[in-house]
Amino acid sequence: MAKSKIRVRYAPSPTGHLHIGNARTALFNYLFARHNKGKFILRIEDTDLKRNVKDGEKSQMDNLTWLGIDWDEGPDKGGDFGPYRQSERKSIYDPLIQQLIDEGKAYESYMTEDELSAQREAQKARKEMPHYVYEFAGMTEDEKQAKIAAAKAAGIQPVIRFHVPENTTYAWDDMVKGKVSFESKTVGGDFVIKKRDGMPTYNFAVVVDDHMMEISHVFRGDDHVANTPKQLMIYEAFGWQPPKFGHMSLIINTETGKKLSKRDETVLQFIEQYRELGYLPEAMLNFIILLGWSPVGESELFSKREFIKMYDEKRLSKSPAAFDGKKLEWVNNQYIKKADENEVFAMSIRQLIKAGRLPQRPDMSQIEWTRTLVSLFKNQMSYTGQIVDLADLFFNGPADINDEAKAELDNDTALPVLKEFRQRIEDIDVFEATAIQKTIKSIQKDTKIKGRALYMPIRIAVSHEMHGPELPETIELLGRETTKKHLDAMIAELAK
């Protein structure tokens, strides 16, 4: 197919926030379209009215935009193939369903949910795979019409079922998995294409929409493989050419070794959650691309532009993709390190305000102090939300000192160093890191105490920690009075 004819889509249901797996589906379709100079379409599959949530569509769009994924056609942009919400396309679906009924390829089914449930339970008891059994089997036409009349009189709304062809093989050359085939007898019998509420089912609407919107390629999750033979049956019934299919591997939680599930609470799974924690969109996009796709070479960090240029669907993996939270933190840390200082500052100060560490409207002195604070911890943060805990010393004072730190002060030089430093910081004119460093160096020159023996007692005294950011900068941010307070407390403790 010519590149100019390439049209792909991402078609979420507005039933909640953007999930990692769905974000990957959107991203791989987006990259395929952009690499091949094709079109990327956003379509909203909102036919499951009971499961749709308020603002679900908006949430999907907001998070896609945040990730840097834009679309050429969609409910907000329009296009030549709209409407782009399935709930607005009923007038397109209904005549096509009627066409199938008229051609004997679909029919009204009046079995109630209780009857269907009883049928499934009986099949399970016989150790059979649950499947729909034609409800009018063995009936004469008069008996069939009598049953339908009784159902209508009882107020039962029918569903429309598609008549599954017997003894037929449905196969396709999957762009990821290779050759895949299903026997028609394995799909669970005649399946519903129109629900009792009058809305089409997913498997019917998706075929109609993909055909009408001239979708050329469909990249989606491996969990859709079982839907594909049903969809191929509908394509065949209408005499339409199906698109090329590619089913991407499952995403596995490395902590549990199981498929990433929305019920899995061991890992955050929604893009919104990572936004709130302070992950960078470029880092999230980079990480998600690596879930089932690999670039040539050893490097893993690329810009969106670079990914678009190098993207090759043949490098999609057949093996499950491992969702590794530690890897995500590493990727995001790399992006934070090279990110614009102002961007990281803006994200970090929002986190501090949200946590109540700063007022809703900080004054200029608080803003400048926070700017220095963020620069101090910038390279340590895996995500900007960590600034709240990393900087806890500056808001809540030192945590309890541990035994290892106490042992570090159990020597003959710790107390003299602290006393000297406490005395000399009184003489610092401008209390900033450069002057503080000179003061520490002057103690080294005068006492001959240096290295760990010099710096560690001061660090432990002011922070109760053995490790942390640059000591002079830490002391500058604490301020002269707070530093004196911490030093006095430790000197008193060691003098006992």
Swiss-Prot record:
InterPro entries: aa-tRNA-synth_I_cd-bd (IPR045462), aa-tRNA-synth_I_codon-bd_sub2 (IPR020751), aa-tRNA-synth_I_CS (IPR001412), aa_tRNA-synth_I_cd-bd_sf (IPR008925), Glu-tRNA-ligase_bac/mito (IPR004527), Glu/Gln-tRNA-synth (IPR000924), Glu/Gln-tRNA-synth_Ib_cat-dom (IPR020058), GluQ/Sye (IPR049940). This is Glutamate--tRNA ligase. Catalyzes the attachment of glutamate to tRNA(Glu) in a two-step reaction: glutamate is first activated by ATP to form Glu-AMP and then transferred to the acceptor end of tRNA(Glu). Keywords: Aminoacyl-tRNA synthetase, ATP-binding, Cytoplasm, Ligase, Nucleotide-binding, Protein biosynthesis. It comes from Lactiplantibacillus plantarum (strain ATCC BAA-793 / NCIMB 8826 / WCFS1) (Lactobacillus plantarum). Its main location: cytoplasm. A motif ('HIGH' region) lies at residues 12-22. It catalyses: tRNA(Glu) + L-glutamate + ATP = L-glutamyl-tRNA(Glu) + AMP + diphosphate. Coiled coil: none annotated. It is an enzyme of class 6 (ligase). ATP binds at residue 262. Pfam families: Anticodon_2 (PF19269), tRNA-synt_1c (PF00749). CDD domains: GluRS_core (cd00808).
